[in-house]
Regions:
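Mid/C-terminal beta-alpha module of Rossmann-like enzyme folds, strongest
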Residues: 186-245, 261-262, 266-287
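N-terminal Rossmann-fold cofactor-binding loop
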Residues: 31-36
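Conserved sequence/active-site signature of Rossmann-fold short-chain dehydrogenase/reductase
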Residues: 92, 136-138, 176
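NAD(P)H-binding glycine-rich loop region in Rossmannoid oxidoreductase-like domains
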Residues: 37-86, 90-101
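Active-site Tyr-X1-5-Lys
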Residues: 104-130, 139-147
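Substrate-positioning beta->alpha
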Residues: 142-147, 162-184, 191-195
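N-terminal Rossmann NAD(P)H-binding glycine-rich loop of SDR-like oxidoreductase domains
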Residues: 3-24
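Alpha-helical membrane-targeting segments
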Residues: 147-173, 218-257
Length: 287
């Protein structure tokens, strides 16, 4: 059993299922968050804001970073050498060629954050693994599947931009938690970056249909011209209903955003679950 780990951003989507798994592998689990959550077996919560400088105790052997990646490099700079597993996102690649300048700028910021983390890890002797999940779902807090779930339950139908034939590969947060544990257990993942998708590659239209049927609704999905949805997305962002939305998603609805799971499957036995449109029923498996 490993000695001690720190989980930053522990109240994030992935934090819930991950904190259920870590006490089986560490004598002590420290969960850092600006908003500590309910007590979990074997987990000690600590209020922490990574925009400030925090010193990690010398007894900590592992750092699992779920907070925004841009906050990690300063933490690594002031820490002793550790095993580090950090969550990035496939948006680094998928939004790099977006029609939206804002999305391209975001992708560039994410890429720069990855570069800074990699350079700092090498400089300070940390053993780093980067994980890039695809479209997250399962905690009811994501910007795509959770939104579709709420709309499906309320209205019984969903609207998609155009034909919405771009492929997606939604990955459950519990599968990402299992991937983190897999990296802890397999040293061959050190120095690598893995993209993580779900088991299924489905079009955005099929995803909407699955959300409806898995929630007991008829598969009523209607195509709407993108130009009609553009003011809706702008309004949702301006009114802060969905501040993360951008009109670039209308263009990306027609493009594939998938990943290759084979490197993760080969190196640490990654085995994602089938897509579940309810999303909230995935059981965390202790291995």
């Amino acid at each position: 059993m490993n000695v001690e780990c720190v989980v930053t951003g522990a109240s994030s989507q992935i934090g819930g299922p991950l904190l259920e798994l870590l006490p089986d592998r560490f004598f002590r689990v420290n969960a850092w968050s600006r908003k500590p959550q309910a007590e979990v077996r074997g987990v000690a919560w600590q209020r922490a804001d990574l925009s400030e400088v925090y010193k990690i105790d010398e007894t900590v052997t592992h750092l699992i970073h779920l907070a925004p990646l841009a906050l990690l490099a300063p933490v690594l700079e002031h820490a002793h050498p550790m095993r580090v597993i950090a969550i990035s996102t496939c948006s680094v690649r998928h939004k790099a060629s977006s029609a939206s300048p804002a999305e391209r700028k975001l992708a560039e910021k994410l890429k720069n954050a990855e570069k800074q983390v990699i350079m700092m890890a090498r400089r300070k002797g940390h053993q780093l693994t980067l994980l890039r999940p695809a479209m997250l779902y399962g905690a009811g807090r994501d910007g795509t599947v959770a939104v579709l779930q709420k709309l499906a339950r309320r209205f019984g139908f969903l609207l998609v931009p155009g034909r919405a034939l771009g492929l997606r590969q939604p990955v459950h947060v519990a599968d990402v938690a299992q991937a983190i544990v897999g990296c802890i257990d397999h040293d061959k993942t050190i120095g690598r970056c893995y993209e993580l998708g779900g088991r299924a590659q489905i079009t955005l239209r099929q995803l909407a249909e699955r959300v409806l049927t898995d929630n007991g609704k008829r598969a009523r999905v209607y195509s709407v011209p993108s130009w009609l949805l553009r003011p809706v997305i702008d309004a949702a962002r301006i009114l802060k209903i969905r501040p993360d939305w951008d009109v670039g998603l209308l263009d990306r609805a027609q493009k594939n955003q998938t990943v290759d799971n084979r490197p993760a499957m080969r190196d640490f036995g990654y085995d994602p679950s089938p897509f579940n449109g309810k999303g909230l029923t995935r059981k965390v498996i202790r291995r």
